[in-house]
């Protein structure tokens, strides 16, 4: 996954949208944005199936609404490694990838870092 951005970070319908949503079909591969260690691969309410990866120095990424996990907590992953498959789990209206970046636990706009 990682095609066209279909929803940006920021206010959306009066609610702060904490990440970027990418167009994806159920089963499309989801790749790690950077190397790191898998913190969790669980179902978490509205996020549905979510993977969190700790990249060090306070940087954590989240990949949500997945249909399948390809990694488990404690796994080391490389940049570009398949970590799961896109889906429509949790609170969403269609399959897509929700991607979040947190720095020291605070949601940040991923665009600022992906463009560097």
Where are these regions (language model features)?
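Catalytic cores of peptidoglycan-degrading enzymes
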Residues: 2-116
